[in-house]
Amino acid sequence: MRVSASADHNCPRRCEKKFRWRRPRHTLKGRQIADEIERVGLRLQVRKQQAEAGDIVLLYGDESEALTHPYLARVWAKAGADLRVPAPGQAKKVAMLGSLDPVTRQLIVHTSPTKRSSDFVAHLEQLDRLYGPKPGQPAKPVVLVEDNGPIHTSKLSLAALAARAHWLTVEWLPKSAPELNDVEVVWHDLKAHHLAHQTFADTDALDQAIHQAVDALNTERMVLPLARPRISAMKIGREQWAVTRPRPFVGG
């Protein structure tokens, strides 16, 4: 496929033929194995049914990160408004290692300066406290869905998973199959609806904001389990509204 990069997107001939000025998207075509995705997708459907029946706890695991510079999301604003959000200095990041329970819709997050195997093990220890077997208490088997990323398949991580094999089973996702991981959408919700358009002084402030955002997200999803997340509201003016996205502003 060849995509024209010409900037002449106002050409009348193209408008007459219903052309639109659009940006191409990346595709995972050629990197995915269709049969494997279908097979694992069917297995996960069965796992969801088991979780909904109360037979197991199903968790979708993944990693993401947040920046001290503002995450920019689309908002309602007056048409033509030039939205700017201060973004001073060099951006620093905080890694988020999380697991989503699709039945209770609760997100569990461990924050760290890095995304390493030791950080993944720290998140497993977090799951130990929540779902691991405890003396005198019944415990459900836990199924953790993960991709084959290096921090999950390292020697340290595999040893940590093996030590929990009596109560935790891993469902490995196929290569390049983010559409099978339910937590992917929740990362977007967390950033776009709870962390957007904010500038953080340092990583400590960002870390605190992440945990507050997770608490707010979990409360919202528990109170309104069928409601879609709210759009962040940055309103300017009173009429001629349009959905737009702010830009970072590095001026004084």
Pin down the residues of each PLM region:
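Charge-mixed, compositionally biased segments that are often intrinsically disordered regulatory tracts
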Residues: 2-90, 232-240, 244-252
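C-terminal anion-handling pockets and recognition modules
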Residues: 9, 54-56, 183-252
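Generic structural signal for small/hydrophobic residues in well-ordered secondary structure
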Residues: 10, 62, 98-99, 105, ...
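Electropositive, glycine- and tryptophan-enriched low-complexity nucleic-acid-binding patches
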Residues: 55-57, 69-70, 75-139
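Short beta-strand segments
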Residues: 59-61, 142-148, 171-174, 227
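Short, solvent-exposed loop/turn segments at secondary-structure junctions
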Residues: 63-67, 101-105, 114, 149-152, ...
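Acidic/histidine-rich, metal-coordinating catalytic segments
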Residues: 124, 136-153, 176, 181
